[in-house]
Amino acid sequence: MMAAVGAPEVISQLESAAKVLMAPPSMVSTEQRQHAEHIFLSFRKSKSPFAVCKHILETSKVDYVLFQAATAIMEAVVREWILLEKNSIESLRTFLLTYVLQRPNLQKYVREQILLAVAVIVKRGSLDKSINCKSIFLEVSQLISSGNPTVQTLACSILTALLSEFSSSNKTSNIGLSMEFHGSCKRIFQEDDLRQIFMLTMEVLQEFSRRENLNAQMSCVFQRYLALANQVLSWNFLPPNLGRHYIAMFEATPNVMLKPTESWRESLLDHRVMDLFFTVHRKIREDSDMAQDSLQCLAQLASMQGPIFPDESAQVTYLAHLVEGLLNMINGIEIEDSEAVGISNIISNLISTFSRSVLTALPNVLFASFINCLTLLTCSFGRSAALEEVLDKDDMVYMEAYDKLLESWLTLVQEDEHFPRGCFVQPAVQVFNSYIQCHLAAPDGTRNLTANGVASHEEEEINELQEDDRELFSDQLASIGMLGRIAADHCIPLLTGLLEDRVTRLHGQLQRHQQHLMAAADPDTVDRKVLDDLYEDIHWLILVSGYLLADVPQGETPLIPSEVMEYSIKHSTEVDINTTLQLLGSPGEKATSIPGCNRTDSVIRLLSAVLRTSEVESRATRASLTQLLSPQMGKDIVWFLRRWAKTYLLVDEKLYGQISMPLSTAFGADTEGAQWIVGYLLEKVINNLSVWSSEPELANDTVELLVTLVEKRERANIVVQCENWWSLAKQFASRSPPLHMLSSTVQRTLMKALVLGGFAHMDSDTKQQYWAEVLHPLQQRFLNLINQENFAQICQEVAVKQEIVATLEALCGIAEATQIDNVASLFSFLMDFLSSCIGLMEVYRNSPETVNLIIEVFVEVAHKQICYLGETKSMKLYEVCLTLLQVYSKNNLGRKRLDVAAEEDQYQDLLLIMELLTNLLSKEFIDFSDTDEVLRGQEQSSGAGRAVSAADVVLYGVNIVLPLMSQDLLKFPSLCNQYYKLITFICEIFPEKIPQLPEELFKSLMCSLELGMTSMSSEISQLCLEALSPLAEQCAKTQEKDTPLFIATRHFLKLVFDMLVLQKHNTEMTVAAGEALYTLVCLHQAEYSELVETLLSNQRDALIYQRLADAFNNLTASSTPPTMDRKQKVAFLKSLEEFVANVGGLLCVK
């Protein structure tokens, strides 16, 4: 098109098209816009547009047209590179640079695009060495030394364009070259040219740092070069050997550590570089934008690691200089708000990057100064963070900085054995004291005080909006708890004293308020300010105590922290055990009123202070002062007691090398102390559930404490000996108030606890009586209700529905209580209910919440029990699940969900159905039933007459689910994940069933797999790839050609081939895709050869053709001809790694 007309006509056409594209949508039609876009596209594709583009750049006044001309040059240069003379390319580059130099008022986006074209020319030239960056750097160097700020800014733009173009695939221009090409360029660039840019930048910063006064324009130039230095120091260096992580290395990772190659030693290990950045920061620190860049540069220097250091002594020298510079910078300045995060990043990087041996090799005085500085900074940032909270600031810079420093402390003290003994004790004391002070009210603390010491009264509104402190500040509390252990000698007595004091004051306050109320005063006239301050103090003291005394690791038996154990052992000779037990057993007494209270174990005394808090709360409820209490304090108490009980109650001496006598005597197995405290905790639970039933979070924390008391058999054995346990069970079973008012989730957990308790050690009569009182009433009431003749008429009444929902929740709770040794009895009990539940599906078909809850009962039973069930019982469960699915299917047949809310409902029930099917399938993976004596004795195998298999149920379920899965529903991530997990499982476990599916269902399944592979997240794509191998193996087994599955796998061969060879994909998927490709190649060898031939025949570049041909030959050399053999498959996957590394980027273009 463009060749047929002259330059003026081209310009006229382009300017008209630009006018259309720039016009508001209402002014032009879609067709006009598409036509305009087409004009620009064909212009950019035109052959050798260089002369026209030059003419456009020199004559057109339309910015968008100039931008497009620059883009056309950039694309054409790469496209026609081998046809162009070296001189032509050089003159084109010179023209573009001169053009920009001569037009300082160009629009920024036009200038950036022209410079990008220059960068692309340089990049393309760097590969065949026809152009190198040296001449560019010479020109840039001259521009910099011109002293003209505009010209210097342009020089910076040129360097930035080069840096962006070479840095990573994310920022690389889309110029139709292979990823391998981009990678090679980056590696060449980072060895020499990147360093050259860094040196030029250093010269500018050096020059500017010497100047006394900078005007606005000069400051602007300075800022640009500082940002450029930051870009260089944040460069993600490609390692020399790529291996299979080749492509992944292209993807920019957040928080890139500085890992330069050896060639950078001279540049970066020179102390003057680091000194310059410290000097620069001192100069510009009051400008918040520039300060962020200079601190980020220093943070990157603090993260430096890798081959740049010849040995450890070089690291020590470097680190020592860095620490000295940092201390000099911080000492003697008042830190600005904008510096806090940057400084904390430097410290955080330094502590996480350098090994302990390097840190400890620092001169003693320097290391001590650093730890001292870190201590002061942490305390200072903590105070400022507290102030930010009072003022409710949006930008919590000090909180972010404080979190970082506390994280750094955690890193240090967790490895404190590498450091001089006791070197962290004093710093830990200071940081701990500071934290406590910031969280206590005046006069002891500074909580809610503004900078000038005035109290803020907006606390309540702020707190209402926040999530729970123990979640919100869990990382901070973990660090403070750890520091508290390091300095246990100071911190445990401190917490104890403060908590005892607050509880005594709280007790006094509540007594005064009681007298005030008895004088018939209106409760609203009570001034709560003092009370609220006390509650908030107690809240933080209990949280810190909980984190100091115990960890709660996931899935492990929590142990008493070694520092706490050692502290208790160290002081055990000064402890009177009897007085300690008296203190523990007297929560109603003030600790100081007990003679010899100072000769008690401090760890137990801290627990006693919490029990005392709990006792004051309980007494206040008995005195009808509940309205004066804080539910938050109630939550804190049971949270603490649960955390404590998991670790200390019935402490197992076998798990410890040495044990503290006071702890063992007070809480060990078969001790009076343990029995007393179990009784006390149970009493607390019962009291809470009756007083606080309307506070769902507090009630939930309370029943979780109850579960902790019975989940371990040893603890449960003590619990069931308590009379009030039995009365709690009876009360709940009879749905007596106030327990029936608890929220459904709390009722579910309470049921779980009561069932777990039933498996404690009891004689058979007692056990029978227990079940008769806990489970029998539930069954009776349910059957009486649903067997009423008029149930269909009354089923929607509120009271009836509540009863049904409560029963379903209880059934979920019973299922959740399943353990290997109780599954036999629980399964029989639950099975009686499941058939009745299916009847309820019919009754409540128009009530989605109830239907979901019914399905959830099945989900829980399958999830918790299927892995323990033998064959006969599994069959029963499959049959009842199949019936459930049939009823669900009948009720949903042809049902259209029109509104969004309905789709949400459908989303929930579909999710539950798929969860149920996945749980049933899990039997194939996890099956403990063979080793289960409980079940084996009761079952006879009925292999020959199997009525229903898991496959039947699951495939029937998929038949229901597939037609209901719309594209819109797949946008819900949880639904999408569950769906693909399910269909992958099916293909892996029952591949032989797939060819037997009805035609429509088979097609839907194949379409789903293709959609998942090509249009979903990498996680879903991987699941679908994993589904292909078993399907291909199934085809190979049957050796039937032209079946629908055989044809489908042939289609998948092309998809997987393209994914591995032609598309950019996540390296983690290479293995899954490779396994799929191998099995598909075994099945369709001729088609695979055809794909390779077609690909090779399209290669015009002889070099690429040869490399590809060799790579494909090597790929299959180890397995010719390929067969479904594990050894061959492993060899193929190994070859595939090399194949992807060598040609993975060759055909994948950008």
Swiss-Prot record:
Cellular compartment(s): Cytoplasm; Nucleus
Keyword terms, alphabetized: Cytoplasm, Nucleus, Protein transport, Transport
Cross-referenced InterPro entries: ARM-like, ARM-type_fold, XPO1_C_dom, XPO4/7-like
Molecular-function GO terms, alphabetical: nuclear export signal receptor activity
Gene Ontology cellular-component annotations: cytoplasm; nuclear pore
Keyword Cytoplasm on entry: yes
Record-level GO BP terms: protein export from nucleus
Annotated family: Belongs to the exportin family.
Name of the protein: Exportin-4
Organism: Danio rerio (Zebrafish)
